[in-house]
Amino acid sequence: MTDLSIVSVETTILDVPLVRPHKFATTSMTAQPLLLVAVTTAGGVTGYGEGVVPGGPWWGGESVETMQAIVERYIVPVLLGRGVDEITGIMPDIERVVANARFAKAAVDVALHDAWARSLGVPVHTLLGGAFRKSVDVTWALGAAPAEEIIEEALDLVESKRHFSFKLKMGALDPAVDTARVVQIAQALQGKAGVRIDVNARWDRLTALKYVPRLVEGGVELIEQPTPGEQLEVLAELNRLVPVPVMADESVQTPHDALEVARRGAADVIALKTTKCGGLQKSREVVAIAKAAGIACHGATSIEGPIGTAASIHFACAEPGIDFGTELFGPLLFSEELLQEPIRYADGQVFLPEGPGLGVELNMDAVKTWTRN
């Protein structure tokens, strides 16, 4: 058997341009920074993971720069000499050295899974119990352009059968203006595609109580994290108020968070990101709690590149608890392809990459081009 002991860990920061600016409630970005983590074994196998947050530290306090420092200074010493098949022992040891920093830990967790699976000649989903499906539904995030342009973009995507469900970001504009814009789009797409919204936790209780019902009346099919993540009692109040699903994102980053959401009845759906949870292992714990509580899970995104997206696809295809679709569209937002063969999107689905490990191969020329100097 190939020697699985870790002999080197390398990190690289990339800045990959996007096809258009991507707007959140508090920021926008024209390029997505990625931290590439490469774990190499004595047997000559390299596995890759990706540290990524949506546009910087505004979301969870981490950035590619902090992730790189944490991985290189504190996590690498835990890894060297260990086997890539020791994930269940390695990750708790990392927890003892580094608190929080879940996005950095996710990059390492995925790199270990990729290296181990490649060493065995099997896909990552095999290590997770095996894939029970080969594709999952994928929602597309629409931009911040005027409503007429957004409607045209969405209808074009429906016509081409690439997407049948769309998300709109809110929270950056005046709530009345924001709501009117979203309702205009939702009504234009009614009967053709679903529309959901994400406020990125930027509304207070009174604003949410005023505008969330208007959004639902206007045809919005799902409300994601309208209020601050820690205010579970407000999220629960909104969940009782409206007849459409309420989804928790910022409110759930750990298994304990999922337990609290379940106890309070704060959400019908959890936005499960393998990044914010700290990797594939911790993500399984979150999904297990959600399943036990009867809460659905949605395969959400931090705008990952192809490595992070491939990892989340493997997870979603191996985990029946991801039962509310996904938004694993990250690579489609990038203007530059980082893989030798792109991840496949068609018919409103994203397809499981085939082959050992994550089933994708980096184009190292493209990686070099977009490496930060």
From Swiss-Prot:
Mn(2+) binds at residues 198, 224, 249. Keywords: Aromatic hydrocarbons catabolism, Isomerase, Manganese, Metal-binding. It is an enzyme of class 5 (isomerase). Pfam families: MR_MLE_C, MR_MLE_N. One of its GO terms (biological process) is amino acid catabolic process. Its cofactor is Mn(2+). It comes from the Bacteria. GO terms for molecular function: chloromuconate cycloisomerase activity; manganese ion binding; muconate cycloisomerase activity. InterPro entries: Chloromuconate_cycloisomerase (IPR013370), DgoD-like (IPR034593), Enolase-like_C_sf (IPR036849), Enolase-like_N (IPR029017), Enolase_C-like (IPR029065), Mandel_Rmase/mucon_lact_enz_CS (IPR018110), Mandelate_racemase_C (IPR013342), Mandelate_racemase_N_dom (IPR013341). It catalyses: (S)-muconolactone = cis,cis-muconate + H(+). Its EC number is 5.5.1.1. The active site is at residues 169, 327. NCBIfam families: mucon_cyclo. Belongs to the mandelate racemase/muconate lactonizing enzyme family. This is Muconate cycloisomerase 1. The gene is catB.
